[in-house]
Amino acid sequence: MGFEIAAVSDRPELAPVVAAWLVDAFGYPGGRTVEEMTALLLAPPVGPEETFVLFDQGVPVGTASLAHRDLEARPDLTPWLAGVFVQPAFRGRGHATALVRRVEAFAAAASVPVLWLYTWTAEPLYARLAWRRAGLETDQKRGREVVLMTRRLSGLCQASDFGH
């Protein structure tokens, strides 16, 4: 396919690039700055956490993370598939799917039984990837309704089976 996926923990120089994408794509007034997001990406993990970057022909074009916390309204749920982003010029090539599968494989290898995510735009993508709708929630930071989704990971293959 012409792409590879690397962990930010193995390539810390990618943290500012990922931080800029995340702040641009998911930021909100009064939210984290690029510098704060970079520091968060480089901070020691809380449980099984990792951020991945997908390279297309050697160029970083997308990211996704396994995060301990994500949706403020649901601190009881953990961990989360978070920050799934692919640069617009590289969408439609299966990159988001590859990133989601990489995070799922990482989580499964860490014996995570269930993952959570929330989205306001990509429910069809996640539904195609066997995520199921778990309800509606309010994203308090952005003041919008979001779809809460979940995926049971028991029985998934190891990370090496997902082409990383």
Region locations from a protein language model:
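Conserved N-terminal entry element of GNAT/NAT acetyltransferase domains
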Residues: 1-13, 155-164
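Active-site rim helix/loop that mediates acceptor-substrate recognition in acyltransferases
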Residues: 26-55
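Short hydrophobic/aromatic beta-strand or adjacent loop that forms the aromatic wall/cage
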Residues: 49, 143-149
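Conserved beta-strand in the GNAT
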Residues: 53, 59-69, 80, 85
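Conserved hydrophobic beta-strand within the GNAT/NAT acetyltransferase core sheet
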Residues: 84, 115-117
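Conserved acetyl-CoA pyrophosphate-binding loop and the N-cap/start of the following alpha-helix
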Residues: 90, 94-102
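Conserved active-site alpha-helix within GNAT-family acetyltransferase domains
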Residues: 109, 113, 120-144
